[in-house]
Regions:
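PAS/Per-ARNT-Sim sensory domains
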Residues: 58-73
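Beta-strand residues that line the small-molecule/cofactor-binding core
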Residues: 77, 91-95, 113
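PAS/PAS-like sensory domain cap-loop motif
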Residues: 36-47
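PAS-family sensory/regulatory domains
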Residues: 48-59
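Sensory-domain boundary capping and coupling elements
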Residues: 96-98, 118
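PAS-family sensory domains
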Residues: 23, 83-89, 93, 102-105, 108-123
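Sensory modules in modular signal-transduction proteins
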Residues: 2-26, 31-34
Length: 123
């Protein structure tokens, strides 16, 4: 995803964690902001190109992840809560929203990326 300088400035200034992934079955992280780094303890250079599943663990709710996958396959926005894990292994409860980003308009629009906005509920 090619980010304009204005869009990047907004994401970089956000208090919430922002992660952008590729679509089309690759599901690779292409961007994270500083709030993501602070929340998770992972540096951007260490997560770019990875599938975000590495943030999940034993207490991550499988039903929530199934709903996420279902909504994204239908090109719908997902919103939910789950437990993810920081780089040091500590869990955190987060509320997050994942939005499909489409190229084009109408029936021919294709999902190119997903934008995940994450907010910690409990440390």
């Amino acid at each position: 995803m090619e980010m304009t300088s204005g869009l990047k400035a907004i994401a970089d200034a956000s208090f919430d964690s922002v992660m952008i992934t590729s679509a089309g079955g690759k599901n690779q992280i292409v961007y994270v902001n500083k709030a993501f780094e602070k929340l998770t303890g992972y540096k951007a250079k260490d997560v770019l190109g990875k599938d975000p599943k590495f943030l999940q663990g034993a207490a991550t709710d499988p039903a929530t992840i199934r709903q996420l996958v279902k909504d994204l396959k239908a090109a719908k926005t997902f919103e939910g809560r789950t437990i993810n894990y920081r780089a040091d292994g500590s869990p955190f409860i987060m509320h997050w929203r994942v939005l499909p980003v489409k190229s084009g308009r109408g029936a021919s629009a294709k999902v190119e990326n997903y934008v995940a906005i994450q907010r910690v509920i409990s440390a």
